[in-house]
């Protein structure tokens, strides 16, 4: 065999190279291509393989496409996701819709990671809550996480500001919360050293839960008085209005810690006359703020 013949690719070499090129386009891979032909149920996409890929009409976008030629001009190169391996003719099936959904899950995960709130439009309701659309994904907002819990049908078509409760790409589960979004917004407005007004909503051995009108704060038992407190129920009752100083904020977890002991003029004052301390809380807060700043 001559050197030139040895270096000349054989028919088998071409066949192997062509097969390798076809195998490059497998399910889950991204390919680039242009429309080369339209059909009644889709379009054929030139991706440089053995055969053009097929794009079903239902996979052309997240929404229904009526005019495929207007939606996908022939001279426009786009990126597609392979959703079905090649058939016996070497043709793979591709999708723009599946690619858009994958990109949407990535964006939503990034928004959740950043603690962002988003706006969604309510698309429907059931006994458990409402459904909404976010980036083309179907989301669910439980009834317990809505501001309006009674007439859910009235929410259809409305835009809500929500936070993320769960983003699960594998299970295609996207759960949102309107109440948490409101709480997040309120927490961001509150500052350490601020005197807040609230209402007592819970009494526990470890402290008092205070509703701030959209967010719940905790007044720990060791922050009630400079003196030992044996029973929070001896000082506060459910429904009591309360003023307290914000001493700590955890923006990541949405937690607000309060204190009334910093408002006392002497240890145990709140145990003796809680009404007097609350009535003059604004004047006491200025002194307490200076003490916090000096620490």
Swiss-Prot record:
Residue ranges constituting the S1 motif domain according to the UniProt record: 28-97, 115-179, 193-261
Alphabetical GO biological process terms: translation
Keyword Repeat annotated: yes
Xref: InterPro entries: NA-bd_OB-fold (IPR012340), Ribos_protein_bS1-like (IPR050437), Ribosomal_protein_S1-like (IPR035104), S1_domain (IPR003029)
Gene Ontology annotations for the cellular component aspect, listed alphabetically: ribonucleoprotein complex; ribosome
CDD domains per record: S1_RPS1_repeat_ec2_hs2 (cd04465)
Example GO molecular function: mRNA binding
SMART domains for this protein: S1
Family: Belongs to the bacterial ribosomal protein bS1 family.
Name listed for the protein in its UniProt record: Small ribosomal subunit protein bS1
Protein source organism: Synechococcus elongatus (strain ATCC 33912 / PCC 7942 / FACHB-805) (Anacystis nidulans R2)
Gene from which the chain derives: rpsA
